[in-house]
Amino acid sequence: MKFAQFKRGYVLTVFVIVSATAHGEEIDRGVLIRLSNALVKVEALAADGALSLGTGVTVAPGRVVTNCHVTRNAENITIMRGGLRWRAMKQLADVEHDFCLLSVPRLDATPAEIGKAAALAPGQPVSALGFEGGIGLQIRLGKITSIYLHDGNRVLRTSTPFTSGASGGGLFNKAGQLVGLLTFRQRGTDGNYFSIPVEWFVQSIDNLPGYRAVAPLAPGLKAFWQRVQDKLPYFMQANSLAVDRRWVQLLQLASRWEQLEKTSIEPWLARGSAYAGLARPDEAAVSYQAALKLDPKASEALYGLASAYSQQGNSEKYKSAEQQLRLINPDLAQDLANEISLKQPRSIPSKS
């Protein structure tokens, strides 16, 4: 646990969790201070007295972005930072994509620098900042684990854990630029934490006619990730099936998915994962090779291909795929090496 003292007696409590995939990288203290100055706590008070707590990121003078699932029932929204409180007067809501932009006059907070989710790749380090539990601001370090195309942009999956109260918090790249909003998590192992991309809301920040007086949003509207199981985006359905180790059903889903998105690598990655789960490395390798034909620099496909070659016991092809991966994504290549060393601590046997 580390502590950093800020102006007005504001103490930022930072719990830094560095996963093995972050390779010991730390955030520069100056960057840490700059990021913390953009984060605010969000209190959303409903007519029945119910209080919803979340996090927001200052994205322009007097403008804060958070998740709509934090503010959707609110009649009154309060923004807090450093012991001070401001009232949000207006909001621009996009419930489907789960972002709400808030107009907060006289807000004393430094806007975050905006980056691009589209510039990220699996394996790259990121940091997640949010008021977990509605108490102190916490920072989690991790990496991008997967990227999924949805509605023309990239939903980011990371290994940076977050809990209630952090919704609407910021996901930042290594340079300290805002690339996404911490939004939801799926049941499963580590790395099932998802952020919506900045590209979804950045063009709406200055859309003044789109802002309305703060009031409860229309009932019945749901974000894309809150739909019933068979209406969820394919990447979420695939993740649930993989968590449950329902490999045959995942293969069936991948087939339907591929018919709808013929130029996407995601169905092939899902197919490869299913074959790997079924201990069919030859077919897994074919699936990952198909993904690489669509995107020769797809590091997730190279990762899966190398892992399939390892399952086959083909050391020569494994080394070739691992070397290609290391050129494109050194962090992910190190993850692969760690995984293989755990499974086969001595060596990968040559194929007979």
Where are these regions (language model features)?
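Catalytic nucleophile loop of clan PA
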Residues: 57, 162-182
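N-terminal activation segment of mature serine protease catalytic domains
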Residues: 23-57, 64, 76, 214, ...
